[in-house]
């Protein structure tokens, strides 16, 4: 029966809530098909809280179940398990919330959601998108960090604040996008391509806080994964908590366990860098001090030698040796000069003995014709020729009165 109301006579909230509760209560117990997500078992309580997700639509229903019923399920319930539950919808009037009170749970097969993701994971792995050799190293100090995250989200604060705490001068280009729902993937892909085309962006971080399996589905979407694989800029995945592992973690160049962990990976710690510089300075000073000490030891060793204890004595000894060598050199040179002089005199004497003048001194003569040519035989002159006779001392001009051939030579006396 419809409630009667008007602007002048509105229905109180409590009445509306009560009527909703009555309508919901009329549904009675029903079997519901869905996937288990966001399971919460609180210690010390007998109630298990979880969500039932429609496998074909983005619709979720809060459900509760007695702990003993939940723990009797075989196989052990996990995120994404496809089940059929017997429950009664109840509307909690004080909070105005709807939940399904479950009395029985029956698994109807492995969760389609996880199975689909597993199939996609195998396909991408076979294509080599997870290969370690595809992973690019992060820059030591990026000029600009591209950050893709929800607008004003905790993930944004975690990355920005922790990164600036480590390196205050770090710059960010933040792209605010939807991080769940039907618009998440296209917005993330568009932001990714814009940042990848920016030449000053040296690394891109995709960050989101924790959530249910269905909340994190965009980060296992094939379109997004292939866009990340095609990026030229290194990409860091920082999705959820440490236990969350979307497929983006396998494709990204670096998989950070949390947004805070991503901040630690993308920039160095300025305090650590100062400490390393100080350590390097200490090592350099120690190395120089060690080198100086070693050279000082070498110098002290050299100074301790006797030759350096009294260096003048060695110089004097060397000087005396040089003087001795000079004297020996002079003596040897004088001896060599005297021997050379004697040899020269002997050679001069021999040359003089062999010279024509010496031969003439011994009584020989040289006969020349008027032209100065030497007459060597009687057949070179005729009777009446005038000749010049060169003696050891002086010359004679003579006239040939007789010519005798060699075979009929007459004694000198007969010529006269």
UniProtKB/Swiss-Prot annotation:
It catalyses: Exonucleolytic cleavage in either 5'- to 3'- or 3'- to 5'-direction to yield nucleoside 5'-phosphates. It is found in: Cytoplasm. The keyword Hydrolase applies. Its main location: cytoplasm. Its EC number is 3.1.11.6. Keywords: Cytoplasm, Exonuclease, Hydrolase, Nuclease. Pfam families: Exonuc_VII_L (PF02601), tRNA_anti_2 (PF13742). One of its GO terms (molecular function) is exodeoxyribonuclease VII activity. One of its GO terms (cellular component) is cytoplasm. GO terms for biological process: DNA catabolic process. HAMAP family: Exonuc_7_L. Heterooligomer composed of large and small subunits. Bidirectionally degrades single-stranded DNA into large acid-insoluble oligonucleotides, which are then degraded further into small acid-soluble oligonucleotides. Belongs to the XseA family. This is Exodeoxyribonuclease 7 large subunit. It comes from Acidothermus cellulolyticus (strain ATCC 43068 / DSM 8971 / 11B). The gene is xseA.
